[in-house]
């Protein structure tokens, strides 16, 4: 995989995203994220949580996931996306002033469309961008009067053999949380890849 210059941006092409065919060594830059904790006379090394990047555009979010794979940091990243889902922008024809007060978590149609968008569009596009297999399975659902949250977790081997994961010590899990509220159609997506 080629690395892009900081000034140069590559357009996201979901049909031509490169697959991650084999694992590599953990980047040396990650050693700065390891902290030592002393407790009861012993010292334990702990990896700090990955720094969070904020996005307001799905394409920028997916490009970040692709770039983290290119940079060999696919197993240590945290991204937060706040956006209006495509089915909302399509319904209001791109004019956000036309958003109806019923376009939120209280509407069964909104919840159904959002769930369809997550499972049929967002997650498959994230998988294409990452270059490895994502298997989030069934979602855990938390609902309160003010918000609805889908929680997904993937602790699979991501399409790599256990031998290859052990050889490079690359074991990681993925967490994906998608939240909507009862006030507007804004959707919050929190994606985290954490080494285990």
Curated annotation (Swiss-Prot):
Q: Which organism is it from?
A: Debaryomyces hansenii (strain ATCC 36239 / CBS 767 / BCRC 21394 / JCM 1990 / NBRC 0083 / IGC 2968) (Yeast)
Keywords for the protein's UniProt record, in alphabetical order: Cell membrane, Membrane
The question of whether Membrane is a record keyword is answered with yes
Q: Spell out the Pfam families in the cross-references.
A: RGI1
Record's bilayer topology term: Peripheral membrane protein
Which cysteines are disulphide-bonded? none
Primary localisation category? membrane
Could you tell me what this protein is called?
Respiratory growth induced protein 1
What are the GO BP annotations of this UniProt entry?
A: energy reserve metabolic process
Instruction: Please give the family membership noted in the entry.
Output: Belongs to the RGI1 family.
Q: What is the lineage of its organism?
A: Eukaryota, Fungi, Dikarya, Ascomycota, Saccharomycotina
Question: Mind telling me which GO cellular component terms the entry cites?
Answer: plasma membrane
Quote the subcellular location field of this record: Cell membrane
In this chain, the stretch annotated as Disordered covers 28-48
């Amino acid at each position: 995989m080629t690395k892009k210059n900081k000034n140069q941006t590559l357009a996201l092409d979901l049909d031509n995203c490169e697959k991650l065919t084999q694992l590599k060594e953990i980047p040396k830059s990650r050693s700065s994220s390891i902290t030592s904790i002393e407790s009861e006379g012993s010292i334990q090394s702990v990896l700090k949580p990955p720094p969070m990047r904020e996005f307001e555009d799905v394409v920028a979010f997916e490009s970040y996931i692709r770039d983290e794979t290119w940079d060999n940091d696919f197993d240590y990243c945290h991204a937060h996306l706040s956006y209006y889902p495509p089915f909302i922008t399509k319904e209001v024809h791109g004019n956000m002033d036309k958003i109806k007060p019923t376009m939120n978590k209280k509407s069964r149609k909104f919840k159904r469309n959002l769930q369809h968008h997550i499972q049929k569009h967002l997650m498959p596009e994230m998988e294409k961008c990452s270059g490895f297999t994502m298997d989030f399975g069934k979602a855990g659902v938390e609902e309160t009067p003010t918000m609805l949250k889908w929680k997904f977790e993937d602790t699979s081997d991501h399409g790599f053999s256990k031998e290859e994961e052990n050889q490079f010590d690359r074991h990681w899990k993925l967490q994906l949380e998608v939240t909507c509220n009862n006030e507007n159609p804004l959707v919050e997506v929190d994606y985290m890849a954490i080494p285990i």
